[in-house]
Amino acid sequence: MIDLRSDTVTRPSRAMLEAMMAAPVGDDVYGDDPTVNALQDYAAELSGKEAAIFLPTGTQANLVALLSHCERGEEYIVGQAAHNYLFEAGGAAVLGSIQPQPIDAAADGTLPLDKVAMKIKPDDIHFARTKLLSLENTHNGKVLPREYLKDAWEFTRERNLALHVDGARIFNAVVAYGSELKELTQYCDSFTICLSKGLGTPVGSLLVGNRDYIKRAIRWRKMTGGGMRQSGILAAAGMYALKNNVARLQEDHDNAAWMAEQLREAGADVMRQDTNMLFVRVGEENAAALGEYMKARNVLINASPIVRLVTHLDVSREQLAEVAAHWRAFLAR
C-alpha cells in the first residue's frame, strides 16, 4: 500500500527498532531514564536552548507549551489554520482557560505583525491579557522566511510577549533553509519537535526552552497524563531519528517536487508544492471517486476537493511514478 495521506504514517526502520531494543531505561518520572535524558539533552544542544522535555504526542506538547506560558484568563495570538488552534480539540481553552485570538495568515504562512499588533489587548479589565504569539514552521508545508522569524522575535521583545513555535516539522524547515536548527530557534522562547512525522519514529515529541520554562512544563506534563516510566524505549527512536533521519528529508522534498511536475504533465491542477507537501485541486465532484479509484489500486489519499499529498521515508520515487500513472489514467477516463 502506498500511503500519501500524511508523514505520520511512517514506520520505524529495522535499525531504529534495534536501537529501541538496546536502549537502557529507568523511571522517567523520577528523571532516571538515561535514554530520555540523553535525548532531551541532545535536543537542547542542537537548538541552543537550555532544556527539553519528552512527551508522548505533539498535541500534548503544544498543550503543555501553552499551559507553561499562559495563566488562566490570558490569551495567545495564533493563525486561523494553526494546528494548536484548529486541530487540537480546543485543549488550551478547555483545559487551560487560555483564550485563543486567531488571525488570518499571509500566503507565505506568516502572521502579519501589523495584524498581530492590532490584536494585542490593552491593559483593561474587560480583556484577556495577551501573553503569547504562536507561530508554526513549517505551516502547511510552507517554510517561514528567515527574516520574518527575526522580525517576529524583535516584535515580541518590544511588546513583552513570549514567542512559541509549533515546530512539528521544523526539521523540514531546517533542511529547506540549509541551516542548523539553532539558526531558527534562536528566535523563539520555546518550540516543539514532532518525532513521529517525517523523522519516522513510532511516537513522541519534544518541547524545548529555558530551564525554568521546562521545569513548569514537567509539572504540566504530569498533570495532563504524560509522565511515563521506562520511556527510553521510545526516546531511543527519537535519538536515532535526530542523528540519522534529518538530512534525508531533502529526499522527501525532492520527491514532492518531482511528483508535482508529473501530475502537472498528466493534466492535474497542482496548486502548489512546498517541502514534502503538494496540494492538488480535484473538485467536489471528483473527490470521492478519485479516493476510491486510488484505494482500489493500493494508494491511500485523503479524498477531498483539494487533495494534500505528503511524501515521506516510506514512499519511493518508483512508487510515486505508479501514483502519477494512476492519476493520469483517472483523468483520462
UniProtKB/Swiss-Prot annotation:
- Pfam hit, one: Beta_elim_lyase
Q: Keyword check for RNA-binding, yes or no.
A: no
Indicate where the modification N6-(pyridoxal phosphate)lysine is found in the sequence: 197
What cellular-component terms does GO give this entry?
cytosol
Molecular function terms, GO-annotated: L-allo-threonine aldolase activity
Cofactor requirement? pyridoxal 5'-phosphate
> What reaction is this protein's catalytic activity?
L-threonine = acetaldehyde + glycine; L-allo-threonine = acetaldehyde + glycine
Superkingdom of the source?
Bacteria
Q: Mitochondrion: present as a keyword of the record?
A: no
Write down the EC number: 4.1.2.48
- Example GO BP: glycine biosynthetic process
Q: Which NCBIfam families match?
A: GntG_guanitoxin (NF041359), PRK10534.1 (NF007825)
Function noted in UniProt: Catalyzes the cleavage of L-allo-threonine and L-threonine to glycine and acetaldehyde. L-threo-phenylserine and L-erythro-phenylserine are also good substrates.
* Record-given protein name: Low specificity L-threonine aldolase
